[in-house]
Amino acid sequence: MMKYILVIDHIATGGAERILIDYYHYLKQNGHVPYVFVLSGYSGQSKWTENVDVFYGSCNDENNLIKKTLQQFNLFFRLKKIVADIKPDVIFSFLEKSNLLTILVPTSAVKVVSVHNVLSLQYTKIKLGIVQKLTYCMIRWMYNKCNNVVAVSKQVKDDLIVSFGVRSENINV
């Protein structure tokens, strides 16, 4: 029996959310002990979380840059405490904010992060050059720090390598 923490930004009706919920039930059916940490949301917000052990980091996403930054620090410390209390064998995360927090949290657990989007396309909306450059540097640093990056397609993997300089040996499709 292994303990898992599955980390995601929020639970709505997207593909990453569906994968997380299916994986949670798969783990539980196979005798493992899974937990879910949702960065933003609240109990009862999604029908998908019925009969799922969920911890919520905050009730909503902040839009103000300063408040958003403070919220990220609070989420990090909340996840760090949950990891210390549960002592998971594996932490599996979905989506960028969750991936960053998972990579940063200190633990001996195996960390697996997943990338579901072509990030260079996703971040074209960032118009300020310095902000885009910092975002690209953070993505490169983050995914090079983790040797268990799961890309949902070859296109996503190729984008991480070409656009962000992530080492190919860190990425599995």
Segments the model singles out, each with a brief description of its role:
Residues 90-92, 106-123, 150:
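Active-site proximal beta-strand in glycosyltransferases
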Residues 83, 87-89:
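Proline-aspartate-enriched helix->loop->beta-strand connector
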Residues 53-78, 124-131:
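A short, charged, and often flexible helix/loop element on the N-terminal side
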Residues 77-81, 130-149, 165:
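Membrane-proximal helix-turn-helix segments that form the acceptor-binding/catalytic region
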Residues 6-14, 18-67, 156, 164-172:
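N-terminal strand-loop element at the rim of the active site
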Residues 75, 93-99, 115:
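Short His-centered aromatic/hydrophobic patch
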Residues 1-5:
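Extreme N-terminal starter segment of soluble prokaryotic enzymes
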